[in-house]
Amino acid sequence: MIEKYYNWATLGTGVIANELAQALEARGQKLYSVANRTYDKGLEFATKYGIQKVYDHIDQVFEDPEVDIIYISTPHNTHISFLRKALANGKHVLCEKSITLNSTELREAIDLAETNHVVLAEAMTIFHMPIYRQLKTLVDSGKLGPLKMIQMNFGSYKEYDMTNRFFSRDLAGGALLDIGVYALSCIRWFMSEAPHNITSQVTFAPTGVDEQVGILLTNPANEMATVSLSLHAKQPKRATIAYDKGYIELFEYPRGQKAVITYTEDGHQDILEAGKTENALQYEVADMEEAVSGKTNHMYLNYTKDVMDIMTQLRQEWGFTYPEEEK
């Protein structure tokens, strides 16, 4: 049972905003309001989901005293400007990944959240899917022994259209911020501490964004991970997490619901299933509301920070910046 109903607003009306509206409806809630750069699109979205308020100007959402939580679902490069306004006005914020362009922006946002005593979090599905919490319990039991190696794949086939946002430098496109953030978040979930030694290879699209990336990471505990990313070569979204006494295979890991655990000694397998892929946004909403209520905070902003530090370091080593970082 939901103890308190919070007023959620969405900033943006794209695919994720639709998922959010549907997730709230599934929980017996409704979006309170919608803000969009184009009023007509906001009105169309509001009509579709029975939302009572559409703002004439996008900034009105930050000043509305009835709004408790804002979900930011706009392109990466717009996040920090909206985060500044939302947090400064005392709004709790759940922000679509990647939460910012770089670590400097994220540190600023965290400082603002702490100053204004509000919850800031990245909408990273991996941190909220039930399968991950069950796997964490298994790992913590010691049954699999110490972690040795993680292998991550995420290959997405995007049409080779350089006007597409995935290939647009002006819209903060590229493999790392769009899909790599999932792989790195999964790695951080299982690693006992953040990686400190990071090497990589990258190839760029004609627009200058990272199209293919290979990453090797190790941490002080000698846990190792490899990542293979592509925006123009399909790969299965599969994670293999290898321990001393067995390994975990996670399928469709960004919103995973099934894992196979194989034990090295005798080869026997356990199949673990938890949660449902289609309920990913419901799990995020539930955890965010728990954090806002002050009961428990399972938003893992510390993991988000570690992942952002990795992505920032990688892009610095590649000499790859976005226009906002050059001002």
Regions found by a protein language model. Name each.
Residues 1-49, 327:
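N-terminal Rossmann-like dinucleotide-binding module
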Residues 127-198:
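Predominantly a Rossmann-like dinucleotide-binding segment in NAD(P)-dependent oxidoreductases
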Residues 55, 95, 120-122, 250:
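Hydrophobic residues in well-ordered beta-strands that form the structural core
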Residues 185-256, 285-291, 295:
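Contiguous beta-strand/loop segments that form the cofactor/metal-binding neighborhood of enzyme cores
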Residues 273-286, 299:
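Active-site loop of classical SDR/Rossmann-like NAD(P)-dependent oxidoreductases
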Residues 1-2, 60, 69-71, 220, ...:
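C-terminal helix-rich "cap/oligomerization" subdomain common to oxidoreductases
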Residues 20, 38, 52-112:
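Beta-loop-alpha module in the N-terminal Rossmann-like domain of NAD(P)-dependent dehydrogenases
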Residues 108-125, 146-148:
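Rossmann-fold dehydrogenase core element
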